[in-house]
Amino acid sequence: MGKQVLDSGWLAARSTELELTGVQLTTTRPPSGTSAPWIEAVVPGTVLGTLLKNKLVPDPFYGLNNEGILDIYDSGREYYTFWFFKSFECKLSENQHVSLNFRAINYSAEVYLNGHKEILPKGMFRRHSIDITDILHPDGKNMLAVLVHPPDHPGQIPPEGGQGGDHEIGKDVATQYVEGWDWMAPIRDRNTGIWDEVSLYTSGPVKIADVHLVSSFFDMFRRAYLHSTVELENKSSWRAECSLTILVTTELDGDFNLIEYHQTHELSIPPESVIQYTLPPLFFYKPNLWWPNGMGKQSLYNVEITIAVKGFGDSDSWNNKFGFRQIESAIDEATGGRLFKVNGQRVFIRGGNWILSDGLLRLSKKRYMTDIKFHADMNFNMIRCWGGGLAERPEFYHYCDIYGLLVWQEFWITGDCDGRGIPVSNPNGPLDHALFLHCARDTIKLLRNHASLALWVGGNEQIPPEDINSALKNDLKLHPFFKHNGVTVIGEDMLSETEDPSQYLDGTRVYIQGSMWEGFANGKGDFTDGPYEIQNPEDFFKDDFYSYGFNPEVGSVGVPVAATIRATMPPEGWQIPLFKRLSDGFIEEVPNPIWEYHKYISYSKPGKVHDQIVLYGQPTNLDDFCEKAQLVNYVQYRALLEGWTSRMWTKYTGVLIWKTQNPWTGLRGQFYDHLHDQTAGFYGCRCAAEPVHVQLNLATYFIEVVNTTHEELSDVAIEVSVWDLDGTCPYYKVIENVLVSPKKVLPITELKYQGSKNAKPVYFVLLKLFRPSNTTILSRNFYWLRLPGTDFKLLEPYRAIEAPLKLTSEVNIVGSAYKIQMRVQNLSKNLNSESVNFLANDEKSDLSKKEGYISRICSGFKNSGTDSLRVVETKGTGSGVAFFLHFSVHAVKKDENEIEDLRILPVHYSDNYFSLVPGETTNISISFEVPHGVTPRVSLRGWNCSEEHYSVL
């Protein structure tokens, strides 16, 4: 009883190279191995992924390789129509039943098993289940062949590219990004393949399917009920007398499970029938609630439902993680933006747009875990699954449940491909509306039990055709328990008189018809999202930057580190852009053809934004360019989020950045690259999106404290220090007795250093929010700033001042997993003297407090005295701020002549791209896994710190 996943041992062959039928393949003429035309197949995966695995095509994401791969429009659909073959063993006992399940195929298929044929209907986002009980061979040895056809309308890629190519893919119920976008090259096979899980499922005479779990709350979330409806299919020819048991447990520390509920109900199911059975609601008093990232724990219960049949025993079981939580959404009266509440608490949305993890649909659990943890590490609380991408997989949602990411899931409509593109096409959406609705309803059943799923949206920058939109509104209408704005409209005493909410398809989440409607952008569907290019950092704080309460898309630059450029492009792609100075003084960047193909966008906007990279000096080579790009990435995205947060609840209810990552080796709009290395923008977001945060408003130069939590922030103080390039501190102030109400932004005081007569053209500002009672730092924020009309070119000679650093590490190794606690100290001496000129006399009195505060705040790391401690001091002899330090992890070279990319990825850092003032210490946690036989080393580099290699063994 249970599931057997078929994810290995598959073979594939192009249909035009094989003259055998499916009946022959699964009876008398099966393939004997990887002799032509058969090759090893990638399942789950795509045809292009299979061809790449067998080196029959070059890596489409490397350089310009994609241009050398035949496009489906030019080759014809038959070229990417493939057979997939697998033999498997499955032997049944009496009264057992088995189904063959495909969780998704793109786009249609013919299935042959032991000579029997089954035609699978079209649609990329639907499950297929075939009862194969009577088809299996008695000896348990079986042969399976699947002929997979591409989408019916794969479309043509115009020479100039475009948003969704010629839009033909919009006629099918399929992912649309595959025709290419302004951030994506086209996918040549249009993601044809068995792209999701294939499995065998064995049960007894009665099978469980499509369980629906819902929680309802009363009495300010102290009283809760778990509602559940189960679909039960009796596959036997006799009436089944059954016992249905539900078991609810919660995990305690030490891998112990606490049983919360264990109930059994008796029922009878007619022969060869399917019934819906609703269990009585289970009552919970003060259950552990599931909260979004940054608001509390992601408490999850385990729900197991088992069906036993009289005379047979256990027939089937189902289990799933479940989070008690309630999501509300309405248009906020104060801002006009869409407002979300979880468990009665307002959530200020800071998150990002998501396309999909990989353009060849290599969607492993490990990759999903890294992707979602990265979003949580950035302190984000929402991911928007864009309508031109996927209905994301259960594994994606599992990790969103674990890490607390709310998910906005769109259906497969985009303005570009469905009525608003240039040229206009498919104004009535996909050709088969019934198919679209079938896929939508099946997707809802697949995903609805996930606590992280927050809302359904009809499409991207477009609404579905009227009949589809009306059907979705009806299918997703809210149950009366959830039609409220903070107050439950039905009392607990009405539970027995109201239709159980688990009987709805999904009545717990709002349905919004499109991404720019009903509280998003201007709410009317006009193109009022964006912008998507480089900005002056201070502009994000200005009142006229964005006019509406919730921006679903605002984006900018995203060049990765130089090592990624070298790993994903040939040497001719390592040439940095040409910087062409225009007559008005602005700079136009001209990228090389490979960068242009990989959708690079400029770090300048002639006429509005001066080149943000050249502000640091003309880059000389790829390493210099990418290092300066990281400076800009950090500043750009920190300013974006801090600008939005500065007007939390007064003007804005949320923002989603376009976009957090790329499904290929693109060069725009990303916080980590396709290889899973973070940009500095990642850590700019992590800083800005802290639940409790201190920040500098770059438009007003007021220091602000942000409290997004539902608790008052009291007994806190702010330390403000300004540092010159020579390591002196001309400005220091401590502001005590700060109190910030829940969910408020409080301006504290204006930073006036930049207006003083002795202000330096380039200077550093360090803000610390801390508790004086125990010197716990709640938020730390480091800025590098310039006076108006100047640039950052004074930082260029600063590189020659080698900052002296001390690194202390403690290493923990379990199998292939490494966890390193790294303490980094700037050994520079504090050069302050009593002759330092302050702006006002009242600030001079704070000087005597400075050393005490700094030494206490920076003393958090204690030497444990264990053998795993290592200490290294760099050779720097200069003095001043250790600027823009960043760790990386590499494999130790086995040969000094090795030049390939030796980075170990992914790596999770508690912080990176950080700076330390003289005498300051910080602690960084680093975790990663190493491949077998690889010895890792940690590298620390910085603007004024040359690379140091640090072996962890």
Swiss-Prot record:
The keyword Calcium does not apply. It catalyses: Hydrolysis of the alpha-D-mannosyl-(1->6)-beta-D-mannosyl-(1->4)-N-acetyl-beta-D-glucosaminyl-(1->4)-N-acetyl-beta-D-glucosaminyl sequence of glycoprotein to alpha-D-mannosyl-(1->6)-D-mannose and N-acetyl-beta-D-glucosaminyl-(1->4)-N-acetyl-beta-D-glucosaminyl sequences. One of its GO terms (molecular function) is mannosylglycoprotein endo-beta-mannosidase activity. The active site is at E461, E553. It comes from the Eukaryota. It is an enzyme of class 3 (hydrolase). Its EC number is 3.2.1.152. Disulfide bonds: none annotated. Keywords: Glycosidase, Hydrolase. It holds the Pfam family Glyco_hydro_2. Ubiquitously expressed. GO terms for biological process: carbohydrate metabolic process. Signal peptide: none annotated. Glycosidase that specifically hydrolyzes the Man-beta-1,4-GlcNAc linkage in the trimannosyl core structure of N-glycans. Does not hydrolyzes pyridylamino derivatives sugar chains containing Man-alpha-1,3-Man-beta or Xylose-beta-1,2-Man-beta. Heterotrimer of 31 kDa, 28 kDa and 42 kDa subunits. Belongs to the glycosyl hydrolase 2 family. This is Mannosylglycoprotein endo-beta-mannosidase.
